């Protein structure tokens, strides 16, 4: 009987790379949305040819590699969104205060995928009402009276009602190529971030 096997250390290294890739994909490529669709051909490939000569011999080495790989994957994921056809605005939707990770994720994805929200951004309309509406139907149990929303660093909503920031200031703040929407559910310690863009008529 003949066969080919690899050393246990090689198996371990492949497992480390696989875990690092899985972790990186979770916080990068799986955190972007353009039109809400996904291709059956969507693929992430990481190739390691050993040419660098770098060796991962300690937990600290592995952690440093994981962080570096995650950074590269996140930047590539952002570029996918930024390179979308006829993109006018790149928007980061950051949800905090979730009671569970899934709760924060559902809220962030609902806002980032909402056609109404995305079209308002294209028209330089902050429209926090559409944002809180998307959070409300996201499928997670949220308390509207606890929700705070900041748009481009300005308070748009506090406790589920309009904040004191003048509407003209909010409208001016979103007239930029990129900005962030911060949504605090004020229910827990979990957070989630999704990267998206504005929606225009084709």
Task: Please place each PLM-identified region on the residue numbering.
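Single conserved hydrophobic/aromatic residue that forms the stacking wall/gate
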Residues: 1-8, 12, 200-201
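Gly/Ser/Thr-rich beta-alpha loop segments that engage phosphate groups in nucleotides
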Residues: 5, 38, 52, 125, ...
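Short beta-strand elements
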Residues: 6-9, 42-52, 93-95, 109, ...
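Acidic, glycine-rich loop-and-beta core segments that form the ion-binding/anion-interacting portion
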Residues: 17-73
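Glycine-rich, charged/polar anion/phosphate-binding loops
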Residues: 25-34, 75-81, 133-136, 164-169
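Flexible, glycine/charged-enriched surface loops at secondary-structure junctions
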Residues: 29-41, 75-92, 118-125, 144-146, ...
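A glycine- and small/hydrophobic-rich beta-loop-beta segment
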Residues: 50-122
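Internal helix-turn-beta structural module
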Residues: 106-109, 113-199
